[in-house]
């Protein structure tokens, strides 16, 4: 049966294939998307979200973060995360956990607790262990540590770093490994698409963790990008990460533009999506690409970047934009 399926995939013309189908044909594990609980009441959206020919991997955008899962110390709630996980599992889609430790979307008890070093490390250990254990056996990968760097490659002065230095990173990774030995453990960050100080900081961190025998399986490259400004070194930088012996994944891809939308901007966006996909395709250890939701209807961009938007491959009416064809071309050319 599997041989027949593979042969059919091999002979299908590109025009009949969809994004995940083409990613698998290119040797990748998946093409996927983030989603979030509020949009799961939108039936047309949910129908396309479950189209595994386009999306065979799902990331919960917010419902597995610290404020959603441990709102008060030692009290865990997983209901919204379970909704996303169960939906994906029922459809046979891979799951990416997001995220164990992040400086943002923390409950007040973490940010204002004024814990000492050992207490805060114990809190990190317990949170990561409990969260990852709850989803043991369900996740392909976890963003264990999210956005630990400043733009210059130094470590972000988060509540965790201020009290523990980099010790919280190793603590989180070890807790996650013990909680689920078979999930892939990632460090995830933005503005590490091209070479530069921040990417060098990531490389140095991963090397240091490896030298300390701290488990680290992958680097997540968020790829929140701008139309016409894709780093020319993106493929080389993905390869630099891969040369560390870890997986690489593009984890939160969107490519925003200054509004209003024009045909010229849409065509440039199509080319930019193609460029990003081709970079992943060219790097054997780049295992897949996830868009940060697939439709402009639910994009985070307009709420954060004033006057910008239209970042996703589908528009607000759930119609494919030229960017969709850019992804198709990136996998198939």
Curated annotation (Swiss-Prot):
* Triggers of expression: Repressed on glucose.
Q: Which reaction does it catalyse?
A: Endohydrolysis of (1->4)-beta-D-xylosidic linkages in xylans
Q: Establish whether keyword NAD is in the entry.
A: no
Give the GO cellular component terms, alphabetically: extracellular region
Q: What class of enzyme is it?
A: hydrolase
Intracellular or extracellular location(s): Secreted
Q: Which GO terms describe its molecular function?
A: endo-1,4-beta-xylanase activity
**Gene Ontology biological process:** xylan catabolic process
EC assignment: 3.2.1.8
Q: Please state the pathway this protein functions in, per its UniProt record.
A: Glycan degradation; xylan degradation
Keywords for this protein: Carbohydrate metabolism, Glycosidase, Hydrolase, Polysaccharide degradation, Secreted, Signal, Xylan degradation
**Would you say which domain of life the source belongs to?**
Eukaryota
Active site, renumbered? 147 (proton donor), 252 (nucleophile)
Q: Which family does it belong to?
A: Belongs to the glycosyl hydrolase 10 (cellulase F) family.
The entry's protein name is: Endo-1,4-beta-xylanase
Gene field: xlnA
